Amino acid sequence: DSMFEWLNDNLPNGSKILEFGSGTGTIELTKSFEVTSIEDNEQWLYLAPDSTYIYAPLVNDWYDWQALEILQDETFEAIIVDGPHGKANRVHLIDWINVYPNVFNQSRFVVIDDANDTETWQFVELFKQLGWELLHHDPGNEENMGHNWSVFVKIHECPECGEEFNRYNDMIECCANL
């Protein structure tokens, strides 16, 4: 699948990835990356033996916030949004990002699976309002039945010199020594 190729081309081997929603693709991800998988379906738990799973049952159509608290001080190179089941429910991630912005602000980029689907549209629009910009879109093809995904980046500009960074912490360190 081209998403794996894109990630391999754009992330150093061994990079930490957080994925909302896991599946058979998690097995492929763990071949190159250190993966943490948030999963609400017990049947998918531990499918990829090399992934670290966080079991987070759904509460009000979104992963249990208490189960996700463990993530608040974690840093990931990339985040993949492919859950929970029922793509319209992804809109609840916006509330979580607003409470724990660091998890996303430290990420180099965010991959949103099925970004072009009508069910996901509201989430993608709200996500862009948080300052995330489209970097890459793969519309899918006949071979993968139109499976589409998009990559978003957030630019953090140094207020001192104007240099742009993908990660908030890198921007903070830019002119800190002035």
Locate each region found by the language model.
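SAM cofactor-binding core of SAM-dependent methyltransferases
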Residues: 2-60
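Conserved acidic residues
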Residues: 15, 77, 108
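Short amphipathic alpha-helix with an adjacent loop that forms part of the alpha/beta core around
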Residues: 63-74
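Short SAM/SAH-binding signature in class I
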Residues: 74-82
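C-terminal substrate-binding/active-site "lid" region of AdoMet-derived donor-dependent transferases
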Residues: 85-155
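Short cysteine-rich clusters marking metal-coordination/redox-active sites
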Residues: 158, 171
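Cys/His-coordinated zinc-binding microdomains
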Residues: 162, 175
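Short, non-ligating residues that shape and space the ligands of small metal-coordination modules
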Residues: 167-168
